[in-house]
Protein backbone atom coordinates (compact mmCIF):
# COMPACT_ATOMS: atom_id res chain seq x y z
CA UNK A 1 0.00 0.00 0.00
CA UNK A 2 2.84 2.41 0.80
CA UNK A 3 4.39 1.67 -2.58
CA UNK A 4 1.05 2.40 -4.30
CA UNK A 5 0.72 5.71 -2.48
CA UNK A 6 4.27 6.68 -3.37
CA UNK A 7 3.93 5.96 -7.08
CA UNK A 8 0.28 6.84 -7.66
CA UNK A 9 1.26 10.24 -9.03
CA UNK A 10 2.73 8.51 -12.06
CA UNK A 11 -0.68 7.16 -13.07
CA UNK A 12 -2.42 10.49 -13.86
CA UNK A 13 0.66 11.68 -15.73
CA UNK A 14 0.87 8.45 -17.73
CA UNK A 15 -2.83 8.58 -18.60
CA UNK A 16 -2.58 12.17 -19.82
CA UNK A 17 0.47 11.40 -21.95
CA UNK A 18 -1.24 8.29 -23.35
CA UNK A 19 -4.28 10.33 -24.36
CA UNK A 20 -2.45 13.31 -25.84
CA UNK A 21 0.81 12.04 -27.31
CA UNK A 22 -0.78 10.26 -30.34
CA UNK A 23 -1.99 13.72 -31.43
CA UNK A 24 1.49 15.28 -31.44
CA UNK A 25 1.44 15.64 -35.25
CA UNK A 26 -1.97 17.35 -35.22
CA UNK A 27 -1.77 20.71 -36.97
CA UNK A 28 -4.07 23.11 -35.08
CA UNK A 29 -7.13 24.29 -37.00
CA UNK A 30 -9.56 27.20 -36.68
CA UNK A 31 -8.36 29.54 -33.91
CA UNK A 32 -5.55 27.14 -33.07
CA UNK A 33 -4.00 27.84 -36.46
CA UNK A 34 -3.70 31.54 -35.58
CA UNK A 35 -1.86 30.82 -32.34
CA UNK A 36 0.38 28.24 -33.99
CA UNK A 37 1.38 30.62 -36.76
CA UNK A 38 1.98 33.38 -34.22
CA UNK A 39 4.35 31.17 -32.21
CA UNK A 40 6.24 30.01 -35.31
CA UNK A 41 6.50 33.56 -36.69
CA UNK A 42 7.72 34.91 -33.34
CA UNK A 43 10.45 32.28 -33.20
CA UNK A 44 11.46 33.15 -36.76
CA UNK A 45 11.34 36.96 -36.64
CA UNK A 46 12.21 37.61 -33.00
CA UNK A 47 10.59 37.40 -29.57
CA UNK A 48 9.08 40.66 -28.32
CA UNK A 49 5.88 42.01 -26.78
CA UNK A 50 4.34 42.51 -30.21
CA UNK A 51 5.26 39.22 -31.89
CA UNK A 52 4.06 37.27 -28.85
CA UNK A 53 0.72 39.07 -28.63
CA UNK A 54 -1.04 36.12 -30.22
CA UNK A 55 -4.66 36.27 -31.29
CA UNK A 56 -4.83 39.87 -30.10
CA UNK A 57 -4.26 38.83 -26.47
CA UNK A 58 -1.59 39.90 -24.01
CA UNK A 59 -0.15 36.39 -24.02
CA UNK A 60 3.56 37.18 -24.12
CA UNK A 61 4.86 34.93 -21.33
CA UNK A 62 2.97 31.72 -22.11
CA UNK A 63 3.39 32.08 -25.86
CA UNK A 64 7.02 32.95 -25.21
CA UNK A 65 7.53 29.52 -23.64
CA UNK A 66 6.05 27.86 -26.72
CA UNK A 67 8.10 30.05 -29.05
CA UNK A 68 11.29 28.90 -27.32
CA UNK A 69 10.53 25.37 -28.52
CA UNK A 70 10.51 26.64 -32.11
CA UNK A 71 13.84 28.46 -32.20
CA UNK A 72 15.78 25.46 -33.49
CA UNK A 73 13.16 24.06 -35.87
CA UNK A 74 10.18 26.35 -36.61
CA UNK A 75 7.01 24.35 -37.12
CA UNK A 76 8.04 21.54 -34.77
CA UNK A 77 4.63 20.54 -33.41
CA UNK A 78 6.00 17.71 -31.28
CA UNK A 79 8.06 20.23 -29.30
CA UNK A 80 4.97 22.35 -28.64
CA UNK A 81 2.96 19.35 -27.43
CA UNK A 82 5.88 18.25 -25.25
CA UNK A 83 6.08 21.72 -23.66
CA UNK A 84 2.34 21.78 -23.06
CA UNK A 85 2.49 18.30 -21.54
CA UNK A 86 5.27 19.41 -19.20
CA UNK A 87 3.17 22.41 -18.15
CA UNK A 88 0.11 20.19 -17.70
CA UNK A 89 2.07 17.87 -15.41
CA UNK A 90 3.08 20.93 -13.41
CA UNK A 91 -0.59 21.86 -13.14
CA UNK A 92 -1.45 18.35 -11.89
CA UNK A 93 1.28 18.63 -9.26
CA UNK A 94 -0.19 22.00 -8.23
CA UNK A 95 -3.69 20.56 -7.89
CA UNK A 96 -2.24 17.73 -5.82
CA UNK A 97 -0.55 20.27 -3.55
CA UNK A 98 -3.82 22.17 -3.20
CA UNK A 99 -5.63 18.94 -2.31
CA UNK A 100 -3.05 18.10 0.36
CA UNK A 101 -3.97 21.39 1.99
CA UNK A 102 -7.71 20.97 1.48
CA UNK A 103 -7.82 17.29 2.48
CA UNK A 104 -4.88 16.82 4.85
CA UNK A 105 -3.73 13.51 6.26
CA UNK A 106 -3.38 9.95 5.03
CA UNK A 107 -7.08 9.15 5.41
CA UNK A 108 -7.78 11.17 2.25
CA UNK A 109 -4.95 9.86 0.06
CA UNK A 110 -7.24 7.72 -2.15
CA UNK A 111 -9.65 10.60 -2.74
CA UNK A 112 -6.79 12.98 -3.53
CA UNK A 113 -5.26 10.51 -5.97
CA UNK A 114 -8.56 9.87 -7.74
CA UNK A 115 -9.44 13.56 -8.01
CA UNK A 116 -6.07 14.36 -9.59
CA UNK A 117 -6.61 11.44 -11.98
CA UNK A 118 -10.00 12.81 -13.02
CA UNK A 119 -8.44 16.22 -13.62
CA UNK A 120 -5.69 14.59 -15.71
CA UNK A 121 -8.06 12.68 -18.00
CA UNK A 122 -10.69 15.41 -18.32
CA UNK A 123 -11.42 15.72 -22.06
CA UNK A 124 -11.44 19.51 -22.00
CA UNK A 125 -7.84 19.49 -20.72
CA UNK A 126 -6.68 17.26 -23.58
CA UNK A 127 -8.57 19.28 -26.19
CA UNK A 128 -7.24 22.60 -24.91
CA UNK A 129 -3.70 21.22 -24.77
CA UNK A 130 -3.73 19.96 -28.37
CA UNK A 131 -5.62 22.85 -29.96
CA UNK A 132 -3.04 25.60 -29.42
CA UNK A 133 -4.53 28.59 -27.56
CA UNK A 134 -3.84 30.98 -24.71
CA UNK A 135 -6.53 29.50 -22.45
CA UNK A 136 -4.31 26.51 -21.79
CA UNK A 137 -1.70 28.82 -20.30
CA UNK A 138 -4.41 30.33 -18.10
CA UNK A 139 -5.34 26.83 -16.89
CA UNK A 140 -1.78 25.83 -16.04
CA UNK A 141 -0.70 28.97 -14.23
CA UNK A 142 -4.03 29.31 -12.44
CA UNK A 143 -3.45 25.86 -10.92
CA UNK A 144 0.02 26.90 -9.79
CA UNK A 145 -1.24 30.22 -8.41
CA UNK A 146 -4.05 28.47 -6.54
CA UNK A 147 -1.68 26.03 -4.84
CA UNK A 148 0.79 28.78 -3.94
CA UNK A 149 -1.96 30.90 -2.38
CA UNK A 150 -3.37 27.95 -0.45
CA UNK A 151 0.03 27.30 1.11
CA UNK A 152 0.74 31.05 1.48
CA UNK A 153 3.90 30.82 -0.60
CA UNK A 154 3.57 34.35 -1.90
CA UNK A 155 6.81 34.53 -3.84
CA UNK A 156 5.79 31.43 -5.78
CA UNK A 157 2.34 32.97 -6.20
CA UNK A 158 3.99 36.06 -7.67
CA UNK A 159 5.85 34.02 -10.28
CA UNK A 160 2.83 31.90 -11.21
CA UNK A 161 0.56 34.96 -11.12
CA UNK A 162 2.80 36.89 -13.48
CA UNK A 163 2.72 34.01 -15.96
CA UNK A 164 -1.06 33.82 -15.50
CA UNK A 165 -1.63 37.52 -16.15
CA UNK A 166 0.46 37.40 -19.32
CA UNK A 167 -1.19 34.28 -20.70
CA UNK A 168 -4.44 36.09 -21.52
CA UNK A 169 -6.41 39.04 -20.16
CA UNK A 170 -8.83 36.69 -18.42
CA UNK A 171 -5.82 35.27 -16.60
CA UNK A 172 -5.32 38.63 -14.90
CA UNK A 173 -9.02 38.72 -14.00
CA UNK A 174 -8.83 35.20 -12.58
CA UNK A 175 -5.71 36.00 -10.57
CA UNK A 176 -7.32 39.18 -9.24
CA UNK A 177 -10.34 37.16 -8.07
CA UNK A 178 -8.26 34.34 -6.57
CA UNK A 179 -5.90 36.68 -4.73
CA UNK A 180 -8.64 39.08 -3.66
CA UNK A 181 -10.74 36.32 -2.13
CA UNK A 182 -7.66 34.83 -0.49
CA UNK A 183 -6.84 38.15 1.19
CA UNK A 184 -10.46 38.62 2.21
CA UNK A 185 -10.68 35.20 3.83
CA UNK A 186 -7.37 35.75 5.64
CA UNK A 187 -8.57 39.10 6.95
CA UNK A 188 -11.84 37.57 8.16
CA UNK A 189 -9.91 34.94 10.10
CA UNK A 190 -7.84 37.57 11.93
CA UNK A 191 -8.83 39.40 15.10
CA UNK A 192 -9.16 43.12 15.84
CA UNK A 193 -10.28 46.16 13.89
CA UNK A 194 -10.44 46.28 10.12
CA UNK A 195 -7.05 47.98 9.83
CA UNK A 196 -5.52 45.58 12.36
CA UNK A 197 -6.70 42.72 10.17
CA UNK A 198 -5.82 44.14 6.78
CA UNK A 199 -2.32 45.54 7.41
CA UNK A 200 -0.51 42.32 8.37
CA UNK A 201 -2.30 40.36 5.65
CA UNK A 202 -1.35 42.81 2.91
CA UNK A 203 2.19 43.14 4.27
CA UNK A 204 2.83 39.38 4.23
CA UNK A 205 1.11 38.84 0.88
CA UNK A 206 2.60 41.88 -0.86
CA UNK A 207 4.78 39.85 -3.30
CA UNK A 208 1.60 38.24 -4.63
CA UNK A 209 0.25 41.69 -5.53
CA UNK A 210 3.16 42.46 -7.84
CA UNK A 211 1.78 40.61 -10.91
CA UNK A 212 -1.37 42.74 -10.87
CA UNK A 213 0.69 45.91 -10.48
CA UNK A 214 2.95 44.86 -13.36
CA UNK A 215 0.00 43.96 -15.60
CA UNK A 216 -1.80 47.24 -14.89
CA UNK A 217 1.39 49.19 -15.62
CA UNK A 218 1.88 47.27 -18.86
CA UNK A 219 -1.68 48.02 -20.01
CA UNK A 220 -1.18 51.69 -19.17
CA UNK A 221 2.04 51.75 -21.20
CA UNK A 222 0.35 49.98 -24.11
CA UNK A 223 -2.61 52.35 -24.12
CA UNK A 224 -0.30 55.36 -24.07
CA UNK A 225 2.13 54.22 -26.75
CA UNK A 226 0.34 51.78 -29.07
CA UNK A 227 -2.40 52.33 -31.60
CA UNK A 228 -4.44 49.24 -30.71
CA UNK A 229 -6.57 48.38 -27.70
CA UNK A 230 -4.58 47.14 -24.72
CA UNK A 231 -6.97 44.21 -24.29
CA UNK A 232 -8.49 41.85 -26.83
CA UNK A 233 -11.40 43.22 -28.85
CA UNK A 234 -11.10 41.69 -32.33
CA UNK A 235 -13.60 44.14 -33.80
CA UNK A 236 -16.61 42.54 -32.12
CA UNK A 237 -17.41 45.67 -30.14
CA UNK A 238 -16.53 49.29 -30.79
CA UNK A 239 -14.94 49.29 -27.33
CA UNK A 240 -14.02 46.23 -25.26
CA UNK A 241 -16.14 47.35 -22.30
CA UNK A 242 -19.27 47.13 -24.47
CA UNK A 243 -18.98 43.36 -24.39
CA UNK A 244 -19.66 43.31 -20.65
CA UNK A 245 -23.10 42.12 -19.55
CA UNK A 246 -22.96 42.34 -15.77
CA UNK A 247 -26.60 41.67 -14.95
CA UNK A 248 -28.08 40.30 -18.17
CA UNK A 249 -28.98 36.70 -17.38
CA UNK A 250 -31.51 36.29 -20.19
CA UNK A 251 -28.99 36.47 -23.01
CA UNK A 252 -28.71 33.53 -25.41
CA UNK A 253 -24.91 33.56 -25.16
CA UNK A 254 -25.18 33.44 -21.36
CA UNK A 255 -27.48 30.42 -21.60
CA UNK A 256 -24.99 28.75 -23.90
CA UNK A 257 -22.14 29.51 -21.49
CA UNK A 258 -24.11 28.11 -18.56
CA UNK A 259 -24.86 24.90 -20.46
CA UNK A 260 -21.18 24.48 -21.33
CA UNK A 261 -20.06 25.02 -17.73
CA UNK A 262 -22.67 22.94 -15.93
CA UNK A 263 -23.78 20.30 -18.46
CA UNK A 264 -21.34 19.65 -21.31
CA UNK A 265 -19.45 16.37 -21.20
CA UNK A 266 -20.81 15.03 -17.89
CA UNK A 267 -20.30 18.37 -16.12
CA UNK A 268 -23.85 17.89 -14.87
CA UNK A 269 -22.58 15.16 -12.51
CA UNK A 270 -20.56 17.46 -10.21
CA UNK A 271 -23.07 20.26 -10.85
CA UNK A 272 -25.84 18.03 -9.48
CA UNK A 273 -23.90 17.48 -6.26
CA UNK A 274 -23.42 21.23 -5.89
CA UNK A 275 -27.10 21.89 -6.56
CA UNK A 276 -28.22 19.29 -4.02
CA UNK A 277 -25.83 20.67 -1.42
CA UNK A 278 -27.02 24.22 -2.04
CA UNK A 279 -30.69 23.22 -1.81
CA UNK A 280 -30.22 21.35 1.46
CA UNK A 281 -28.08 24.16 2.85
CA UNK A 282 -30.72 26.74 1.96
CA UNK A 283 -33.44 24.63 3.57
CA UNK A 284 -31.41 24.19 6.74
CA UNK A 285 -30.73 27.92 6.82
CA UNK A 286 -34.45 28.69 6.60
CA UNK A 287 -35.08 26.26 9.46
CA UNK A 288 -32.09 27.68 11.40
CA UNK A 289 -30.59 24.23 11.79
CA UNK A 290 -26.92 25.21 11.90
CA UNK A 291 -23.93 24.35 9.75
CA UNK A 292 -22.99 20.83 8.66
CA UNK A 293 -19.60 19.52 9.70
CA UNK A 294 -16.75 18.91 7.27
CA UNK A 295 -14.79 16.42 9.33
CA UNK A 296 -11.14 16.19 8.31
CA UNK A 297 -11.46 18.96 5.71
CA UNK A 298 -9.80 22.38 5.88
CA UNK A 299 -13.12 24.21 6.27
CA UNK A 300 -11.86 27.77 5.60
CA UNK A 301 -10.11 26.60 2.43
CA UNK A 302 -13.26 24.73 1.38
CA UNK A 303 -15.27 27.92 1.83
CA UNK A 304 -12.68 29.83 -0.20
CA UNK A 305 -12.86 27.19 -2.95
CA UNK A 306 -16.65 27.43 -3.13
CA UNK A 307 -16.56 31.23 -3.22
CA UNK A 308 -13.86 31.23 -5.91
CA UNK A 309 -15.78 28.76 -8.07
CA UNK A 310 -18.96 30.84 -7.88
CA UNK A 311 -17.07 34.10 -8.50
CA UNK A 312 -15.23 32.80 -11.56
CA UNK A 313 -18.37 31.18 -12.97
CA UNK A 314 -19.91 34.65 -12.90
CA UNK A 315 -16.90 36.66 -14.08
CA UNK A 316 -16.08 34.34 -16.99
CA UNK A 317 -19.63 34.67 -18.34
CA UNK A 318 -19.82 38.46 -18.15
CA UNK A 319 -17.96 39.10 -21.41
CA UNK A 320 -20.06 37.53 -24.18
CA UNK A 321 -18.48 36.42 -27.45
CA UNK A 322 -18.55 32.83 -28.72
CA UNK A 323 -19.51 29.54 -27.13
CA UNK A 324 -16.06 27.99 -27.05
CA UNK A 325 -15.60 25.43 -24.23
CA UNK A 326 -11.94 26.38 -23.76
CA UNK A 327 -13.01 29.71 -22.25
CA UNK A 328 -14.12 27.79 -19.16
CA UNK A 329 -11.38 25.19 -18.86
CA UNK A 330 -10.29 26.54 -15.46
CA UNK A 331 -13.78 25.88 -14.10
CA UNK A 332 -13.66 22.14 -14.84
CA UNK A 333 -11.31 21.23 -11.94
CA UNK A 334 -12.88 23.82 -9.64
CA UNK A 335 -16.33 22.37 -10.25
CA UNK A 336 -15.01 18.90 -9.46
CA UNK A 337 -13.28 20.03 -6.25
CA UNK A 338 -16.29 22.00 -5.05
CA UNK A 339 -18.59 19.07 -5.85
CA UNK A 340 -16.42 16.72 -3.81
CA UNK A 341 -16.70 19.03 -0.81
CA UNK A 342 -20.46 19.04 -1.35
CA UNK A 343 -20.48 15.22 -1.36
CA UNK A 344 -18.63 15.20 1.96
CA UNK A 345 -21.05 17.76 3.38
CA UNK A 346 -23.99 15.67 2.14
CA UNK A 347 -22.71 12.74 4.19
CA UNK A 348 -21.17 10.48 1.55
CA UNK A 349 -18.92 7.93 3.26
CA UNK A 350 -15.42 6.92 2.13
CA UNK A 351 -16.59 3.91 0.10
CA UNK A 352 -19.33 5.86 -1.68
CA UNK A 353 -16.98 8.76 -2.40
CA UNK A 354 -14.32 6.50 -3.86
CA UNK A 355 -16.78 4.54 -5.98
CA UNK A 356 -18.15 7.78 -7.43
CA UNK A 357 -14.64 9.05 -8.16
CA UNK A 358 -13.62 5.78 -9.83
CA UNK A 359 -16.75 6.00 -12.00
CA UNK A 360 -15.84 9.58 -12.92
CA UNK A 361 -12.36 8.46 -14.00
CA UNK A 362 -14.00 5.98 -16.38
CA UNK A 363 -16.47 8.54 -17.69
CA UNK A 364 -13.78 11.13 -18.37
CA UNK A 365 -11.45 8.63 -20.06
CA UNK A 366 -14.10 7.52 -22.53
CA UNK A 367 -15.37 11.08 -23.04
CA UNK A 368 -12.05 12.01 -24.64
CA UNK A 369 -12.91 10.00 -27.73
CA UNK A 370 -16.69 9.93 -28.04
CA UNK A 371 -19.69 12.10 -27.20
CA UNK A 372 -22.02 9.68 -25.46
CA UNK A 373 -23.28 11.76 -22.52
CA UNK A 374 -27.10 11.44 -22.82
CA UNK A 375 -27.77 14.71 -20.98
CA UNK A 376 -25.40 16.69 -23.22
CA UNK A 377 -26.99 15.09 -26.28
CA UNK A 378 -30.44 16.11 -25.09
CA UNK A 379 -29.42 19.70 -24.29
CA UNK A 380 -27.14 20.47 -27.24
CA UNK A 381 -28.23 17.95 -29.84
CA UNK A 382 -25.64 16.29 -32.05
CA UNK A 383 -24.11 16.58 -35.50
CA UNK A 384 -22.83 13.69 -37.56
CA UNK A 385 -19.09 13.62 -38.15
CA UNK A 386 -19.38 10.56 -40.36
CA UNK A 387 -18.88 7.40 -38.35
CA UNK A 388 -19.49 9.17 -35.04
CA UNK A 389 -21.53 12.02 -33.64
CA UNK A 390 -20.47 15.10 -31.68
CA UNK A 391 -22.35 17.53 -29.45
CA UNK A 392 -23.70 20.49 -31.40
CA UNK A 393 -22.29 23.00 -28.92
CA UNK A 394 -23.26 26.01 -31.04
CA UNK A 395 -26.92 24.96 -31.16
CA UNK A 396 -28.02 27.21 -28.29
CA UNK A 397 -26.39 30.47 -29.37
CA UNK A 398 -25.96 29.86 -33.13
CA UNK A 399 -22.99 32.22 -32.94
CA UNK A 400 -21.25 30.99 -36.11
CA UNK A 401 -22.23 30.76 -39.77
CA UNK A 402 -20.89 27.20 -39.82
CA UNK A 403 -22.49 24.59 -37.59
CA UNK A 404 -19.53 24.31 -35.21
CA UNK A 405 -15.82 25.21 -35.19
CA UNK A 406 -13.85 25.69 -31.96
CA UNK A 407 -17.12 24.77 -30.27
CA UNK A 408 -16.12 21.15 -30.97
CA UNK A 409 -12.90 21.42 -28.96
CA UNK A 410 -14.37 19.83 -25.83
CA UNK A 411 -12.72 16.45 -26.50
CA UNK A 412 -10.37 14.98 -29.12
CA UNK A 413 -12.94 14.11 -31.79
CA UNK A 414 -12.29 17.42 -33.56
CA UNK A 415 -8.77 16.26 -34.49
CA UNK A 416 -10.46 14.06 -37.08
CA UNK A 417 -10.70 17.13 -39.35
CA UNK A 418 -6.89 17.12 -39.56
CA UNK A 419 -6.53 13.38 -40.05
CA UNK A 420 -9.31 13.14 -42.65
CA UNK A 421 -7.70 15.98 -44.62
CA UNK A 422 -4.41 14.10 -44.46
CA UNK A 423 -6.10 11.07 -45.99
CA UNK A 424 -7.56 13.25 -48.75
CA UNK A 425 -4.29 14.99 -49.58
CA UNK A 426 -2.37 11.71 -49.57
CA UNK A 427 -4.79 10.39 -52.20
CA UNK A 428 -4.81 13.58 -54.29
CA UNK A 429 -1.06 14.33 -54.13
CA UNK A 430 -1.66 18.00 -55.00
CA UNK A 431 0.85 20.44 -56.41
CA UNK A 432 0.96 24.22 -56.17
CA UNK A 433 -1.29 24.31 -59.25
CA UNK A 434 -4.00 22.11 -57.76
CA UNK A 435 -6.99 24.26 -56.82
CA UNK A 436 -8.62 23.12 -53.59
CA UNK A 437 -11.72 25.01 -52.52
CA UNK A 438 -13.07 25.29 -49.00
CA UNK A 439 -16.43 27.03 -48.49
CA UNK A 440 -16.00 30.71 -47.70
CA UNK A 441 -17.57 30.41 -44.26
CA UNK A 442 -15.72 27.24 -43.32
CA UNK A 443 -12.11 27.77 -44.32
CA UNK A 444 -10.88 29.60 -41.20
CA UNK A 445 -7.56 28.13 -40.12
CA UNK A 446 -7.77 25.10 -42.42
CA UNK A 447 -5.30 26.00 -45.16
CA UNK A 448 -1.91 24.54 -44.33
CA UNK A 449 1.27 23.63 -46.21
CA UNK A 450 1.72 19.95 -47.05
CA UNK A 451 4.78 17.80 -46.71
CA UNK A 452 6.31 17.56 -50.19
CA UNK A 453 6.71 13.78 -49.89
CA UNK A 454 3.84 12.47 -47.77
CA UNK A 455 1.35 15.31 -48.44
CA UNK A 456 0.27 15.46 -44.80
CA UNK A 457 -0.53 18.83 -43.22
CA UNK A 458 2.45 20.42 -41.47
CA UNK A 459 3.31 23.67 -39.70
CA UNK A 460 6.78 24.19 -41.13
CA UNK A 461 7.69 26.01 -44.35
CA UNK A 462 10.67 23.96 -45.56
CA UNK A 463 10.21 21.02 -47.94
CA UNK A 464 6.52 21.65 -48.40
CA UNK A 465 4.01 22.28 -51.14
CA UNK A 466 1.21 24.83 -50.86
CA UNK A 467 -1.85 23.97 -52.98
CA UNK A 468 -3.84 26.73 -54.64
CA UNK A 469 -6.30 27.14 -51.77
CA UNK A 470 -9.39 29.23 -52.53
CA UNK A 471 -13.03 29.69 -51.59
CA UNK A 472 -15.99 29.94 -53.97
CA UNK A 473 -15.95 33.76 -53.94
CA UNK A 474 -12.27 33.83 -54.84
CA UNK A 475 -12.90 31.41 -57.72
CA UNK A 476 -15.78 33.52 -59.05
CA UNK A 477 -13.57 36.64 -58.95
CA UNK A 478 -11.03 34.96 -61.25
CA UNK A 479 -13.47 35.10 -64.20
CA UNK A 480 -11.54 34.26 -67.37
CA UNK A 481 -8.63 32.78 -65.46
CA UNK A 482 -10.70 30.23 -63.55
CA UNK A 483 -8.94 26.85 -63.26
CA UNK A 484 -10.12 24.06 -65.55
CA UNK A 485 -10.87 21.86 -62.57
CA UNK A 486 -10.94 22.08 -58.82
CA UNK A 487 -11.75 20.06 -55.73
CA UNK A 488 -14.40 21.31 -53.31
CA UNK A 489 -13.93 20.02 -49.76
CA UNK A 490 -17.20 19.36 -47.94
CA UNK A 491 -16.96 18.94 -44.16
CA UNK A 492 -19.47 17.74 -41.56
CA UNK A 493 -19.75 21.20 -40.00
CA UNK A 494 -20.28 23.18 -43.21
CA UNK A 495 -23.85 24.19 -42.53
CA UNK A 496 -25.64 26.08 -45.31
CA UNK A 497 -22.74 27.67 -47.21
CA UNK A 498 -24.21 27.51 -50.74
CA UNK A 499 -20.69 26.88 -52.04
CA UNK A 500 -21.77 24.07 -54.37
CA UNK A 501 -24.61 26.09 -55.89
CA UNK A 502 -22.32 29.05 -56.57
CA UNK A 503 -19.63 26.90 -58.15
CA UNK A 504 -22.20 25.14 -60.34
CA UNK A 505 -22.65 28.37 -62.29
CA UNK A 506 -19.31 27.67 -63.94
CA UNK A 507 -18.49 24.08 -63.02
CA UNK A 508 -20.04 20.66 -63.40
CA UNK A 509 -19.54 17.61 -61.21
CA UNK A 510 -17.04 15.08 -62.51
CA UNK A 511 -16.74 12.71 -59.58
CA UNK A 512 -16.24 12.69 -55.82
CA UNK A 513 -14.50 10.72 -53.11
CA UNK A 514 -15.00 10.33 -49.39
CA UNK A 515 -12.18 10.16 -46.86
CA UNK A 516 -12.55 8.97 -43.27
CA UNK A 517 -10.12 9.11 -40.37
CA UNK A 518 -10.66 9.03 -36.59
CA UNK A 519 -14.38 8.63 -37.18
CA UNK A 520 -14.72 11.82 -39.26
CA UNK A 521 -15.65 11.82 -42.95
CA UNK A 522 -15.22 14.57 -45.51
CA UNK A 523 -15.99 14.62 -49.22
CA UNK A 524 -13.84 15.98 -52.05
CA UNK A 525 -15.99 16.90 -55.06
CA UNK A 526 -14.12 17.05 -58.36
CA UNK A 527 -15.58 19.87 -60.47
CA UNK A 528 -14.63 20.77 -64.07
CA UNK A 529 -15.29 23.91 -66.10
CA UNK A 530 -18.38 23.76 -68.26
CA UNK A 531 -17.59 23.60 -71.99
CA UNK A 532 -13.90 23.25 -71.22
CA UNK A 533 -11.59 20.49 -72.30
CA UNK A 534 -11.04 18.04 -69.46
CA UNK A 535 -7.40 17.21 -68.89
CA UNK A 536 -6.39 13.55 -68.79
CA UNK A 537 -6.29 12.08 -65.31
CA UNK A 538 -3.23 13.31 -63.44
CA UNK A 539 -2.40 16.07 -65.94
CA UNK A 540 -3.42 18.76 -63.45
CA UNK A 541 -0.49 17.67 -61.36
Language model segments and positions:
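Signature aromatic-anchored transmembrane alpha helix within multi-pass, membrane-resident enzymes
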Residues: 12, 110-113, 159, 208-212, ...
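Membrane-proximal lumenal/periplasmic loop motifs of glycosylation machinery
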Residues: 20-30, 44-67, 71-78, 238
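Short acidic/glycine- and proline-prone juxtamembrane loop motifs at membrane-interface regions
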Residues: 29-30, 127-135, 324
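Membrane-lumen/periplasm interface segments of specific transmembrane helices
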Residues: 41, 181, 185-188, 200-277, ...
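Loop-to-helix entry region of an early transmembrane alpha helix in multi-pass inner-membrane enzymes
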Residues: 56, 60-64, 72-93, 113, ...
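Specific aromatic-rich, kink-prone transmembrane helix
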Residues: 94, 137-156, 160, 185, ...
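Hydrophobic/aromatic-rich transmembrane helices and adjacent perimembrane loops
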Residues: 137, 141, 167, 173-174, ...
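Membrane-embedded, lumen/periplasm-facing catalytic core of multi-pass transferases
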Residues: 149, 360-444, 536
Amino acid sequence: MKLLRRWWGVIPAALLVTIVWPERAFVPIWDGSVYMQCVVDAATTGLNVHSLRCGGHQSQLYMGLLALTQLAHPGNLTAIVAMNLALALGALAAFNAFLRKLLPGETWWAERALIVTIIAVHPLLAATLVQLNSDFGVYVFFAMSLAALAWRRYRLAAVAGLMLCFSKETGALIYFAALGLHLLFRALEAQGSVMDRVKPVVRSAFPALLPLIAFAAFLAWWSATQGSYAVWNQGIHERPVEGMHWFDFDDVIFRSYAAIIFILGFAWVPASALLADFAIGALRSVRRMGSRALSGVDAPLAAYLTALTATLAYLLTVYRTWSFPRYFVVLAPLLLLAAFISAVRLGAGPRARRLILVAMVGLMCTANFCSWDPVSRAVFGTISLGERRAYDVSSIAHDFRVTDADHLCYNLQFTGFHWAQNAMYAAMKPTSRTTIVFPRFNRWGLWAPLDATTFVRVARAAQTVMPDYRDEAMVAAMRDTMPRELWLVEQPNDGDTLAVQKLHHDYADADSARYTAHGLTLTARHLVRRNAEVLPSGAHR
